[in-house]
Amino acid sequence: MPEMDIENNIKIISQPVSLLELKQTAKLIFGDMVKGVVDLEKKIMAIGGELHADEEAFLMNHGSIQQNLWGVNLYPDRTFPELVEFDSMINIRPRQNNRSRSVEDENTRKLILKVIGDLIEK
């Protein structure tokens, strides 16, 4: 069972989840989308929060390091990799040469897609 913040519906995903579970999580807040934060070092992600910042804080409280965390939006009705949208305020970090809400470094985007691809059942 994933670690979970009951108050904010945030859970840490370390084992593959189904698209059905993502769709159910989406319905709780946004309808068609799930916010997620990926930890590139631990190869896990947090989902289910209303804000990427809440998921980021949850992961950091569980030992993640901020520089390894990247925010995405997941649209479970789309196919992979189109279901991933790189758009989050937590991604703005000039010290890592990322000056927008997107993920500007192509290698970092590929790593994020790899982690997400491994954590979502096809």
Predicted features along the sequence, with ranges:
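Eukaryotic low-complexity, non-globular regulatory regions
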Residues: 2-9
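Short, mixed-charge, low-aromatic patches
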Residues: 13, 26-30, 65-73
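Negatively charged, low-complexity tracts enriched in Asp/Glu with abundant Ser/Thr
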Residues: 14-58
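Short histidine-centered catalytic/ligand-binding loop motif
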Residues: 18-26, 94-105
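Amphipathic, interaction-prone secondary-structure segments
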Residues: 50-81
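Intrinsically disordered, low-complexity regulatory segments enriched in Ser/Thr/Pro
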Residues: 76-103
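Well-ordered alpha/beta subsegment
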Residues: 101-122
